[in-house]
């Protein structure tokens, strides 16, 4: 067996007289003669002070660095960007959210390649920073491990009528809708505002960040049990230290990201997301990560796996509980062990421990699902997975719906068509949207938006106005992980690419059938052909800057909205 070099890249900056200048630079940041034989580990962090999601990452990065030292490596920390969806929601800033995923992946690749670092610990806390980091790991194919910042504790509020309840960030969006509809006072709205974020950590439900953290653990890219503990929990410091040690161990064994990120690993990730009833954004992100790993994953794989995996997590936004409750009952390993025992998970997949999924779960020996937060597989919330891909005349390439929170098996109604989200929001707040309507928001796709904005503001307003079970919302944009109800997104092809959604007109009948997995525009093809005659897309919204570049490169949502 050939000897494994645990410094596969950094020798070019540490060895020989040609490395004199680079060694001199590295001496200035603390390295010395005793360090040249150590592998150099990039500690990539999306820490910032803009959002509570990332506040713990500076502390966790220090723990990871200590772990790297303990393992025999030398850590070198660097930062990347992160966008807060909670702050950027509902205005122009949301155009930049999904774009940040690509910026994060590109920036981590840039530093790792330029500085010839040997391996990396990747730390993130916000929705797009998690997949961005995992995309970078897959693209680089070095020894790598991911560590999540952890989720926030739920807030607590007492309203003016004496009602007391736990609240998350999603409650604030819905409260805005209720206030605008005259169903909540501004005083109670302020009370909710002051309660939703009591400290550090990512949004607490099974929204996008917690879905992706669970997925990272299921993929084998995070230490077992590391997804669920809250951000403020000191177990996270232990996971940080162990992650630093683990990446050095991976280097010693010659294990790289693509050894872990196999087709079976992605199937495990989909199964776990289905069981939890995770965010629709997981479809985009897993497709993108798989593409970076050169794994043949398609949008149809989600239905194939979802057919056999029950939905067992009673978690917000559609359920009762949050990630802290999952942690109290054993975390992600509980779900993985239940799926493994039922033959719904591949136990032979390699992980960052150097052991297989089955070996890790045997060591942890997690308890069975508690039956409340996490149901048993023979008593599920739904018999199939919490996400479904729809196809039909309105979405030939596909659309995504969170069936875990969808309140109708069949919905048929007349279209109310809007170009971009703002026009739809104005119509809703003016009372021009009625029960039974199908609100169609086009030109919000990856290219046409650009940036495929999340529609949490309008979905929460619909729910807050009491129309959540009576109005269907369709878009070529996407939804927040906190969205629930009659919402279907990721419609592809998008409007700017002459997808059928571009040719829907007010009054057209649209029908969705969840059991049949169909989404159809009930208009004769001859009429659609006539509408296409002389059609031209809306002009680009941005002609300079990152969004102009992005709109020229980005692919269909059905391919993960990737740019490469």
From Swiss-Prot:
Its cofactor is [2Fe-2S] cluster; Mg(2+). The keyword Chaperone does not apply. One of its GO terms (molecular function) is 2 iron, 2 sulfur cluster binding. Pathway: Amino-acid biosynthesis; L-isoleucine biosynthesis; L-isoleucine from 2-oxobutanoate: step 3/4; Amino-acid biosynthesis; L-valine biosynthesis; L-valine from pyruvate: step 3/4. InterPro entries: DHAD_IlvD/Edd (IPR050165), Dihydro-acid_dehy_C (IPR042096), DihydroxyA_deHydtase (IPR004404), DiOHA_6PGluconate_deHydtase_CS (IPR020558), ILV_EDD_C (IPR056740), ILV_EDD_N (IPR000581), IlvD/EDD_N (IPR037237). The modification N6-carboxylysine is found at residue 128. Keywords: 2Fe-2S, Amino-acid biosynthesis, Branched-chain amino acid biosynthesis, Iron, Iron-sulfur, Lyase, Magnesium, Metal-binding. Signal peptide: none annotated. Functions in the biosynthesis of branched-chain amino acids. Catalyzes the dehydration of (2R,3R)-2,3-dihydroxy-3-methylpentanoate (2,3-dihydroxy-3-methylvalerate) into 2-oxo-3-methylpentanoate (2-oxo-3-methylvalerate) and of (2R)-2,3-dihydroxy-3-methylbutanoate (2,3-dihydroxyisovalerate) into 2-oxo-3-methylbutanoate (2-oxoisovalerate), the penultimate precursor to L-isoleucine and L-valine, respectively. NCBIfam families: ilvD, PRK00911.1. This is Dihydroxy-acid dehydratase. The lineage of its organism: Bacteria, Bacillati, Actinomycetota, Actinomycetes, Micrococcales.
């Amino acid at each position: 067996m050939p000897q494994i070099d645990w410094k596969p890249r950094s020798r070019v900056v540490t060895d020989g007289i040609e490395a004199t200048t680079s060694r001199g630079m590295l001496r200035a940041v603390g390295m010395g003669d005793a360090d040249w034989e150590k592998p150099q580990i990039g500690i990539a962090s999306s820490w910032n002070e803009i959002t509570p999601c990332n506040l713990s990452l500076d502390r966790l990065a220090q723990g990871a660095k200590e772990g790297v030292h303990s393992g025999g490596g030398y850590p070198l920390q660097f930062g990347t960007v992160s966008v807060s969806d909670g702050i950027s929601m509902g205005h122009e800033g949301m155009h930049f959210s999904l774009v940040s995923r690509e910026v994060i992946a590109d920036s981590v690749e840039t530093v790792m390649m330029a500085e010839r670092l040997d391996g990396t610990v990747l730390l993130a806390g916000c929705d797009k920073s998690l997949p961005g980091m995992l995309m970078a790991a897959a693209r680089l194919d070095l020894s790598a491990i991911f560590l999540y910042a952890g989720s926030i504790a739920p807030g607590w509020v007492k309203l003016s009528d004496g009602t007391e309840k736990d609240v998350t960030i999603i409650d604030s969006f819905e409260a805005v809708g209720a206030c605008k509809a005259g169903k909540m006072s501004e005083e109670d709205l302020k009370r909710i505002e002051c309660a939703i974020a009591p400290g550090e950590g990512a949004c607490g439900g099974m929204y996008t960040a917690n879905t992706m953290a669970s997925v990272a653990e299921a993929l084998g890219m995070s230490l077992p049990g590391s997804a669920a503990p809250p951000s403020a929990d000191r177990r996270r410091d232990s996971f940080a230290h162990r992650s630093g040690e683990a990446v050095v161990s991976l280097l010693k064994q010659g294990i790289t990201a693509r050894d872990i990120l196999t087709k079976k690993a992605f199937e495990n990730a989909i199964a776990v997301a289905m069981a939890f009833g995770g965010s629709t954004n997981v479809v985009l992100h897993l497709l993108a990560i798989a593409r970076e790993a050169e794994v043949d994953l398609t949008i149809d794989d989600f239905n194939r796996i979802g057919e056999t995996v029950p939905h067992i997590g009673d978690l917000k936004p559609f359920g009762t509980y949050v990630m802290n409750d999952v942690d109290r009952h054993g975390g992600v390993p509980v779900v993985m062990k239940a799926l493994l025992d039922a033959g719904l998970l591949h136990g032979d997949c390699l992980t960052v421990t150097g052991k297989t999924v089955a070996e890790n779960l045997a060591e942890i020996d997690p308890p069975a699902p508690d039956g409340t937060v996490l149901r048993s597989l023979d008593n599920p919330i739904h018999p199939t997975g919490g996400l479904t891909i729809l196809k039909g005349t309105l979405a030939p390439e596909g659309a995504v719906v969170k069936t875990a929170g969808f309140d109708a098996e069949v919905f048929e109604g007349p279209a109310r068509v809007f170009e971009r989200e703002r026009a739809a929001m104005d119509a809703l707040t003016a009372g021009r949207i009625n029960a039974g309507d199908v609100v169609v928001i086009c030109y919000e796709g990856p290219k046409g938006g650009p940036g495929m904005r999340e529609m949490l503001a309008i979905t929460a307003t619909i729910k807050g106005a009491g129309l959540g079970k009576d109005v269907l919302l369709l878009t070529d944009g996407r939804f927040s992980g906190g969205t629930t109800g009659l919402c279907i997104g990721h419609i592809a092809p998008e409007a700017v690419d002459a997808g059928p959604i571009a040719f829907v007109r007010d009054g057209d009948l649209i029908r969705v059938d969840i059991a049949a997995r169909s989404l159809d525009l009930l208009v004769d093809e001859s009429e659609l052909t006539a509408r296409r005659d002389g059609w031209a897309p809306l002009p680009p919204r941005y002609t300079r800057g990152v969004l102009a570049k992005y709109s020229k490169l980005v692919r269909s949502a059905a391919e993960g909205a990737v740019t490469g």
